[in-house]
């Protein structure tokens, strides 16, 4: 029997929790009802009650009146005070007092810091005739800074170049977003009632009959604005599980079928499922005939991808592939929860995502309760990466890093700058397609611990990013990346120290400031400080952070003319002329471009959240809610789900789903097996940390003190490794060390290593850099391996060897910072 949600609601003492109030006094504390986001980082934004006394945060509790998380909080959020009060916090702006890497700093004022930045741009870029495109801007995974930092890039620095440098193929989330947009026109998420304000009580909602958890551990990751415990509730309501993952997880232990493909081969299972479902006629005929295009073409194409073919590559038994396909297809309501492996565990992320979207479609698992709902940002508040294009200098916008610069065919369809073009031009100083000079003179990064986090090919990234003449880092903490390469560092506020708002799907949420920390500023305040100095004519529009947030909520940060009317705005939906593009459009002279009914303060006083009716509606395609013209159907050129997406051609992607082997696999390069016998799955998640964050929190480290790599008992015995031994993982790119954790749920030829590790308690100055490079799995990964369309990268199926760490071994930090790394043969656009 499933959880009785009404019984839970009836059990809440609403008077004790001050229903209808957003702040009150309780036992000498001021209590504020709000939502938490970054920093410290999180993919989600759960309702919290913040208890403050004498201006300091004293206690954190979950808010049971919050329908998003129902009062549940993860251990990181409960440990928020340790992060807020961490000795690693950056208190003041500081400029470098010694050489890069020495970790010597001199305190300066915010006015001095802003002037230092503005003067550099004016004297070293503008006065020397260089364009603003020579400024690169980056940020981390803080999910509530996806609109502020791109805006800073365009409006303050007037550059259009924002994104990750060594982030080949945007191998996090972007492949799923784009890969789903092609066939579906929008993004699907598993329906666990999260779009409904009344949640599990909604009379329309039903739990999935079959839940596929694919390359994901949602209870640990809670990724992409999706709480994994919602799926746990679905299981309580009877959902059967299919787990597809080489590593045993909570889901695999409870699954009807646990499929264990070789890393990099999952797409074969998706194609084989399509084969079984089409050949055995298990499709939802009514849905396919009414709402899908190119079914006959898909059926003919996947006839070649039999379960036996998939078994020969994945090593998953053919009978299990076929039987699990039938379990999914025969379910009245089937749902597929996908993870990061779709972006970073394949050489063709777009095709794998396409194949899985096709599975959803031909089984009728779109927009039906308990399947997948198509979602937008609440109230059509879409300011994000493409906001940079609204305000960038027109000449800089023309020289934005794009696909054509690296001879990659097809339209650019991502708002960020092309990562591979960015890295290639940084390395060579020229545009590969033309040979034209393109100097990079400045890098501004906000909440982005790049070397410990997302920068692939870590040694390569350090080598070339260190050559950028002027680097500014803004972050709540002093990080190894900051110490390694920054010239100026700026303190950023934690979530509890800022007023802000963010929409990621639904609901729209507000963060209310309850305390301050020395001279730390919020992202909005930093934008205003930079903008008032560097683009004063524009920034007369905003007097304070609340003005800025209100503009985000009500106009989507659109360009406003002297008459107060909106002139340009972010796209919210495609038109016949705009499919396949990511850009900005004329707004038609309207004064409000979103559907948001709240100002920031009104949202705070409403309890901090607001669900929108659009996301809470099922069968949107039948009601004319998906297309900008108001017609029934889907937001695609044909108006139907395109099982073979026509837009893929425009994007430079072959439109039929296929399997592309990773660069080094047992079936394509068997000679590598002896030298590099293991697949290294990098980036396994933990409850205690969010990417590179929380390593300074004593409680989190008590639960998880060291970086761990899981290894099977048989492989550990073969290499003489005991549980707790430190081992090297190594290939020609480099090596890193982690502590062996023997785990029976591992295949013998697979390792599962953790990412994001550094130790704030270790020496900060180079070569140590808090151990950042010593434990870094990205020492082994490669750049310039993007899949079709420039999307996705197979970094989660890297090959390596292992051996024990010995006293006297050269540490990777020293190898990278003093000895030039492991390779001296890098060539732009070559792995």
Which stretches of residues belong to each language-model region?
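Long, low-complexity segments enriched in small/aliphatic residues
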Residues: 391, 554-697
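Glycine/threonine-rich phosphate-binding loop and adjacent beta-strand/alpha-helix elements that clamp
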Residues: 202, 496-516, 527, 531-533, ...
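Hydrophobic, well-ordered secondary-structure elements that form the walls
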Residues: 443, 471, 487, 530, ...
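Flexible, small-/acidic-enriched active-site or ligand-binding loops
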Residues: 376-383, 695-698, 705
């Amino acid at each position: 029997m499933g959880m009785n949600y009404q019984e839970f609601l009836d059990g809440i003492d609403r008077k004790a929790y001050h229903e209808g109030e957003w702040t009150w006094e309780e036992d000498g504390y001021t209590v504020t009802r709000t939502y938490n986001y970054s920093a410290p980082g999180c993919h989600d934004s759960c309702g919290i009650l913040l208890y403050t006394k004498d201006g300091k945060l004293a206690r954190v509790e979950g808010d049971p009146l919050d329908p998003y998380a129902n009062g549940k909080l993860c251990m990181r959020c409960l440990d928020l005070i340790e992060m807020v009060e961490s000795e690693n916090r950056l208190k003041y702006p500081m400029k470098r007092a010694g050489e890069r890497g020495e970790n010597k700093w001199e305190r300066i004022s915010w006015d001095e810091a802003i002037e230092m930045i503005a003067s550099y741009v004016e004297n070293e870029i503008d006065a020397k005739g260089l364009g603003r495109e020579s400024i690169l801007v980056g940020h981390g995974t803080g999910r509530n800074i996806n609109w502020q930092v791109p805006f800073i890039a365009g409006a303050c620095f007037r550059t259009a170049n924002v994104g990750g440098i060594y982030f080949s193929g945007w191998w996090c989330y972007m492949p799923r977003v784009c890969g789903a947009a092609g066939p579906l026109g929008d993004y699907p998420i598993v329906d666990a009632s999260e779009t409904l304000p009344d949640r599990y009580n909604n009379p329309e909602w039903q739990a999935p009959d079959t839940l596929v958890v694919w390359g994901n551990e949602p209870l640990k990751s809670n990724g992409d604005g999706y709480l994994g415990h919602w799926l746990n509730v679905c299981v309580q309501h009877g959902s059967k599980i299919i787990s597809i993952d080489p590593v045993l997880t909570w889901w695999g232990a409870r699954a009807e079928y646990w499929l264990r493909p070789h890393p990099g081969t999952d797409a074969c299972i998706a194609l084989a499922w399509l084969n079984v479902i089409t050949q055995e006629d298990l499709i939802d005929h009514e849905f396919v005939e009414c709402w899908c295009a190119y079914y006959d073409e898909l059926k003919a194409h996947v006839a070649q991808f039999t379960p036996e073919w998939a078994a020969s590559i994945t090593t998953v038994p053919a009978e299990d592939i076929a039987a699990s396909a039938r379990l999914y297809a025969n379910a009245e309501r089937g749902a597929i929860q996908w993870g990061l492996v779709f972006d970073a565990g394949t050489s063709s992320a777009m095709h794998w995502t396409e194949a899985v979207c096709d599975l959803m479609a031909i089984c009728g698992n779109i927009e039906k309760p308990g399947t997948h709902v198509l979602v937008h940002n609440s109230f059509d508040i879409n300011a994000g990466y493409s906001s940079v294009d609204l305000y960038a200098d027109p000449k800089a916008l023309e020289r934005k890093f794009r696909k054509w610069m690296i001879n990659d065919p097809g339209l650019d369809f991502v708002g960020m700058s092309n990562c591979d073009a960015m890295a290639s031009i940084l390395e060579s100083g020229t545009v590969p397609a033309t040979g034209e000079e393109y100097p990079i003179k400045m890098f501004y990064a906000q909440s982005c611990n790049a070397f410990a986090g997302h920068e692939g090919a870590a040694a390569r990234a350090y080598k070339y990013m260190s050559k950028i003449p002027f680097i500014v880092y803004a972050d709540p903490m002093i990080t190894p990346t900051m110490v390694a390469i920054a010239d100026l560092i700026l303190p950023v506020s934690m979530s509890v120290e800022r007023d802000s708002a963010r929409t990621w799907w639904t609901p729209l949420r507000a963060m209310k400031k309850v305390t301050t920390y020395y001279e730390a500023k919020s992202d909005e305040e930093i934008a205003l400080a930079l903008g008032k100095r560097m683009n004063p004519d524009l920034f007369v529009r905003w007097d304070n952070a609340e003005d800025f947030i209100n503009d985000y909520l009500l106009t989507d940060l659109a360009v406003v003319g002297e008459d107060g009317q909106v002139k340009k705005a972010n796209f919210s939906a495609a038109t016949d002329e705009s499919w396949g593009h990511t850009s900005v459009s004329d707004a038609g002279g309207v004064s409000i471009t979103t559907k948001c009914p709240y100002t920031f303060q009104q949202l705070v006083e409403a309890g901090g959240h607001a669900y929108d009716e659009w996301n809470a509606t099922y069968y949107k395609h039948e009601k004319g809610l998906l297309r900008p013209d108001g017609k029934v159907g889907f937001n695609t050129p044909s108006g139907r789900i395109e099982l073979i997406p026509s837009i893929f051609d425009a994007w430079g992607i072959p439109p039929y789903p296929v399997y592309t082997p990773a660069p080094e696999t047992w079936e394509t390069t068997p000679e590598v097996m002896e030298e590099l016998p293991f697949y290294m799955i990098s980036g396994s998640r933990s409850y205690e940390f969010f990417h590179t964050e929380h390593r300074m929190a004593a409680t989190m480290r008590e639960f998880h003190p060291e970086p761990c790599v899981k290894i099977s008992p048989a492989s550990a015995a073969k290499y003489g490794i005991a549980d707790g031994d430190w081992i090297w993982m190594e290939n020609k790119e480099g090596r890193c060390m982690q502590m062996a954790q023997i785990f029976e749920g591992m295949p013998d030829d697979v390792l599962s290593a953790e990412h994001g590790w550094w130790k704030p308690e270790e020496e900060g100055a180079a070569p140590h850099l808090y151990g950042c490079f010593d434990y870094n799995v990205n020492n082994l990964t490669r750049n310039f391996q993007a899949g079709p369309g420039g999307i996705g990268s197979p970094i989660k199926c890297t090959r390596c060897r292992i051996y024990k760490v010995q006293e006297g071994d050269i540490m990777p930090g020293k190898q990278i910072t003093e000895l030039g790394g492991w390779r001296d043969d890098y060539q732009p656009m070559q792995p």
